[in-house]
Amino acid sequence: MGINNPIPRSLKSETKKAAKILASFVKPNQVFGADQVIPPDVLKRAKGLAIITILKAGFLFSGRAGSGVIVARLKDGTWSAPSAIAMAGAGAGGMVGIELTDFVFILNTQDAVKSFSEFGTITLGGNVSVSAGPLGRSAEAAASASAGGVAAVFAYSKSKGLFAGVSVEGSAIIERREANRKFYGDNCTAKMILSGRIRPPPAVDPLFRVLESRAFNYRPSNGGRGSFDDDEDDYYDDDDYYNDIPSSFSSTDASSTRPNTRSTRRRAQSGSRYTFDDDDDDDDYGTGYSRNSRLAPTNSGGSGGKLDDPSGASSYYASHRRSGTAQSRARSSRNRWADDEYDDYDDDYESGYRRGNGRDRTKDREVDDLSNRFSKSRISSASTPQTSQGRFTAPTSPSTSSPKAVALYSFAGEESGDLPFRKGDVITILKKSDSQNDWWTGRVNGREGIFPANYVELV
């Protein structure tokens, strides 16, 4: 086992370290067989993970300190972005020595995740119970059968040092708020990260390649009741079962910088192997820009579109800071939306007219509808001032020609006036701006409201 650094570093470095540690705990190798790794059923049920490297030293008194990351499983089955954490603790007794330990803590309950996200700290053995986690397939049935009475946290560890035992009772896991703010943005909190409100940037891709492997999405044919037949034994012991977990996470690994959108990762899970859709090169945010400028940074202060922070998270988070009421945001984008709508009408009308007799019947109906709308608008607003381009400044009411968008993933809404929707819903766009780093107004399922534009894709 290699030696990992317990000293707190940047969140990008901590995430890469966490990916290496987690892979060593869930993927069998020449030293640890399939019966000496965390069972897939335990990983499947996990509500969250904390991965930490701890240095323990003592002479009469002992102290523990280390750093790592914590992630939470969201309601849709995906994982939150990682939050930087640190661990600290102390003990007493005749202990002499030094020890370096890698820990993986499986958070089995939503309360354990909520306790950390709400208060930024949990105390192992204090406000959450902790016990040694089961190992291998032989322990998986017992863990499944007693799932209702397990400890809130399972602890797994690998040590290198002189201490005979490993104990984390009384240790506190705390949020490294400054590291989170430096990586994600000034006002970012652990609660926002673990609730899924912060999108994972490409810089944390190594960890997600492990989290979205088959080992974390194991589905036995018996429905997870804990008994295994011969076919399931063969499948579990199959060498290909863990092939989607990388063996290394070097910086030269080309796949470690692949785009990392939620939709890409969810599509990857449906295949027999963990692959990325090369056609979808949208960056959630970061050093790369998407082809359709879905998450391109807003141009302010002559920045030239370049990001100052390595992950790009600060620009992303700043562009989504909500200011004012929902009504003021809607008013701010109304005029821009009106111009865009008339631009679309002009383009559609002219292109349809030029096609002449070659138009199909559907296009004829659309052009006629647009023509009638223009005629009515000109009659009813003859005294309305026009811009230099001849466009009206007052928008017409939305019609069947309003743009549509498909939800890339679910949005529960944060305030009154927000438009909640589920992944896959088709949303009618009522008001929009030129940028998807903005809040648009739409309608779905009979409701109207505003929503973050980068949650959807125009169709």
Swiss-Prot record:
Domain of life where this protein originates? Eukaryota
Indicate, by first and last residue, each region the UniProt record lists as having compositional bias (Polar residues): 289-300, 372-391
Q: Where is the composition biased (Low complexity)?
A: 243-262, 393-403
Segments carrying the region annotation (Disordered) are 219-403
Ranges where the SH3 domain occurs? 400-459
> Could you describe the post-translational modifications of this protein?
Phosphorylation of Ser-397 is induced 2-fold in response to mating pheromone.
Q: Where is the composition biased (Basic and acidic residues)?
A: 351-371
Q: What else is known?
A: Present with 18000 molecules/cell in log phase SD medium.
* Descriptive protein name: LAS seventeen-binding protein 3
Q: Which organism is it from?
A: Saccharomyces cerevisiae (strain ATCC 204508 / S288c) (Baker's yeast)
